[in-house]
């Protein structure tokens, strides 16, 4: 193991525990809910589950795209379960979550990429758990505006789509069908829609990007109106995935946060263990929406 791949101390985390965590874990196991928290072995699982948030995955566990940073299985996915949105909403209601993030594999085998399935899940969640904030982390749907509209019209509170990396590294890091500028167009289209959605994206560092490229990415994201940005350390999930080119220090993450904030994001979460679905960012969104609700009342 080389210096570039040996994990530093700041990436070591304690084993998850706590009453809230154990309660959510039991419900997840009983309902057979597919959570990204477990699938991706997220280091923040105890903080999130214990604090009333979770990230769940729709449309199966087999993806039609092969991104070189991602540990999800690739292949021909099974048919969609039409009851999945209902079962998801029932499980989330039982967990009494304050914030739910719904994401999915890519389903390029579906005519609409799974957009209508996402929309069904959003509507069921909002019906069963009206006080739960619903964030969706969506694929690019090949940039098809009709499919993006299907998701937007279901009115999630937050819609996220990840650019993942800087423009130069996109062909190396992401599946060849994923395009940097297409992702920007997706985010711009969603932001400009009449639903008034908050938009969010995530960038991994440690893949070989330069500071200048990161700054250009921050600028590109603000140019299309992205509200919330999360920055985190890329970690190699297996020997078959892209290697870590560098481990970014906590101090450098703070510098990136300051730089990104200068471009006008509503919120930037930046740190070694920050992930796309990150408790601090969700806490910010919850507070923002509560302030908006009070303003409407008052």
Swiss-Prot record:
Domain Radical SAM core: 49-266
GO MF terms, alphabetically ordered: 4 iron, 4 sulfur cluster binding; lipoate synthase activity; metal ion binding
Major localization class: cytoplasm
Pathway(s) the chain acts in: Protein modification; protein lipoylation via endogenous pathway; protein N(6)-(lipoyl)lysine from octanoyl-[acyl-carrier-protein]: step 2/2
Keyword Flavoprotein part of the UniProt annotation: no
Cofactor dependence: [4Fe-4S] cluster
Cellular localisation: Cytoplasm
Annotated keywords: 4Fe-4S, Cytoplasm, Iron, Iron-sulfur, Metal-binding, S-adenosyl-L-methionine, Transferase
Cellular compartments per GO CC: cytoplasm
Leading EC class: transferase
Disulfide bonds: none
Entry binding sites for [4Fe-4S] cluster 1: 37, 42, 48, 277
InterPro entries registered for this protein in UniProt: Aldolase_TIM, Elp3/MiaA/NifB-like_rSAM, LIAS_N, Lipoyl_synth, rSAM
Residues given in the record as [4Fe-4S] cluster 2 binding sites: 63, 67, 70
Homology family: Belongs to the radical SAM superfamily. Lipoyl synthase family.
Protein name (Swiss-Prot/TrEMBL): Lipoyl synthase
Protein species of origin: Myxococcus xanthus (strain DK1622)
